[in-house]
């Protein structure tokens, strides 16, 4: 496995691989790898000749009072996990390499970024779209792998790829969960033992919504109320949002019809956790 830190070098490697007729699978991460990331790597290995992972904690997708400085980082640990899974190249650039002083461009996807995480983290998805487009241009992948846990991020990237005619296939991958249902996340390390117990309520609330829908409840506000009640019963919790959107258009709905994405963000202690499920109303 090769670690590459310079953009030019990464571009040259990608060019050479393409010349040799090799397909490239790309797994963009912010590091502090967990089983969710590794499941993306495994799928990439199945579908491509070469797998490239990027590890870059992207400063422009964090707001001024967010956790950029304390976001967990452990490159040596990440390196050994990636190597074990058979990653071929890690692209590990510095902030200066990605954003030199004269950097002036922002990629901004409209409308679908105005709700949910986009609403509570202004500018976040501009930062995501900008870094992902840069990474696509550097790595030139045939396929790129993203977890369904960040459902809105996935929608934003798909939209950008479609609108800008990018030649990369976006492969969504299922959420990987701990045994008690908590979605795997690098931010779970922020949780104390007690908070960790409370954190299972995100998935429980999503399942409560699913059960209500399966029993015929179609009114979003009634389902939301039940979810809120369940979440706020737990210690250390504060709800950022609970949103029901059409799974294809990402438009907010008030009545459950067809395929619905139910997404939430909840603070458990200091950690802001997100989760979602897709439910099909009969």
From Swiss-Prot:
One BP term from GO: pantothenate biosynthetic process
The enzyme's E.C. designation: 6.3.2.1
InterPro entries: Cyt_trans-like (IPR004821), Pantoate_ligase (IPR003721), Pantoate_ligase_C (IPR042176), Rossmann-like_a/b/a_fold (IPR014729)
Matches recorded under CDD domains: PanC
Quaternary structure note: Homodimer.
Extra remark: The reaction proceeds by a bi uni uni bi ping pong mechanism.
Protein name per UniProt: Pantothenate synthetase
Organism: Caldicellulosiruptor bescii (strain ATCC BAA-1888 / DSM 6725 / KCTC 15123 / Z-1320) (Anaerocellum thermophilum)
């Amino acid at each position: 496995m090769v670690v590459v830190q310079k953009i030019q070098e990464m571009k040259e490697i990608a060019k050479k691989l393409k010349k040799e007729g090799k397909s490239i699978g790309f797994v963009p991460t912010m590091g502090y790898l967990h089983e969710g990331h590794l499941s993306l790597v495994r799928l990439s290995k199945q579908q491509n000749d070469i797998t490239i992972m990027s590890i870059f904690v992207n400063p422009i997708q964090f707001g001024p009072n967010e956790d950029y400085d304390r976001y967990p980082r452990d490159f040596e640990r990440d390196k050994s996990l990636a190597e074990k899974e058979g990653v071929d190249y890690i692209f590990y650039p510095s902030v200066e390499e990605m954003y030199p002083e004269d950097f002036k461009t922002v990629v901004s996807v409209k409308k679908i970024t105005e709700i949910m995480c986009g609403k509570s983290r202004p500018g976040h998805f501009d930062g995501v779209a900008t870094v992902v487009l840069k990474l696509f241009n550097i790595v030139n992948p045939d396929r790129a792998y993203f977890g369904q846990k960040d459902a809105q991020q996935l929608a934003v990237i798909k939209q950008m790829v479609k609108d800008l005619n990018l030649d990369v296939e976006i492969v969504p991958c299922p959420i990987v969960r701990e045994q008690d249902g908590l979605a795997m996340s690098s931010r779970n390390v922020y949780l104390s033992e007690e908070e960790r117990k409370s954190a299972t309520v995100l998935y429980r609330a999503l399942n409560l919504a699913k059960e209500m829908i399966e029993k015929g409840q179609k009114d979003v506000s009634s389902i939301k109320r039940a979810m809120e009640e369940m979440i706020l019963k737990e210690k250390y919790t504060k709800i950022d949002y609970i949103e029901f959107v059409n799974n294809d258009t990402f438009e907010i709905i008030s009545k459950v019809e067809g395929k619905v994405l139910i997404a939430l963000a909840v603070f458990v202690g200091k950690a802001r956790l997100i989760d979602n499920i897709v439910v099909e109303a009969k």
